[in-house]
């Protein structure tokens, strides 16, 4: 069997008025670094993002499915799917494939009429609403140590951005499957923002 691209650290946190998502950009095949620029955060709808950990091909297939479903729902109903609905749909897709599973961990985060929300999903479709912090992937045990130590409810979007970068940056130091650049996304009720690399690098230098 051909070995698949995999490996990751992703994090997500709920902030005051929004959600912050972050990941690194390394994909591995065993001990080989297959890519230094792997995309792991995807925009699903106007104010919803999804992070992926696990097998890259499986994750990309799921992203295409859920993006199409979100667009179709908006066209038919004239309004967006809620974050809970997007998560439930993904859960159903994953559960239906439980005997031949998508080898992924997902985080869905964003802002809808209910406010900022983050959910995590496992490969068999189990879903959990995370009310503060979440991390997935091989570097998650390290990232969780940073998040648990420094997260406080009501954190601002800017401070949340720094915390997410710190968590991923720390994981990259110890997890060989995580590395290279850091991607950062901020979502508020007004916008989905992919933070420029220059700003992320400035945050890293300030740590």
From Swiss-Prot:
Regions that span the bilayer: none
Entry GO terms, CC: cytoplasm; proteasome core complex, beta-subunit complex
Main location: cytoplasm
Localization: Cytoplasm
PROSITE patterns in the record: PROTEASOME_BETA_1, PROTEASOME_BETA_2
Record entry for activity regulation: The formation of the proteasomal ATPase PAN-20S proteasome complex, via the docking of the C-termini of PAN into the intersubunit pockets in the alpha-rings, triggers opening of the gate for substrate entry. Interconversion between the open-gate and close-gate conformations leads to a dynamic regulation of the 20S proteasome proteolysis activity.
Name recorded for this polypeptide: Proteasome subunit beta
Species this protein is from: Methanothrix thermoacetophila (strain DSM 6194 / JCM 14653 / NBRC 101360 / PT) (Methanosaeta thermophila)
This protein's encoding gene: psmB
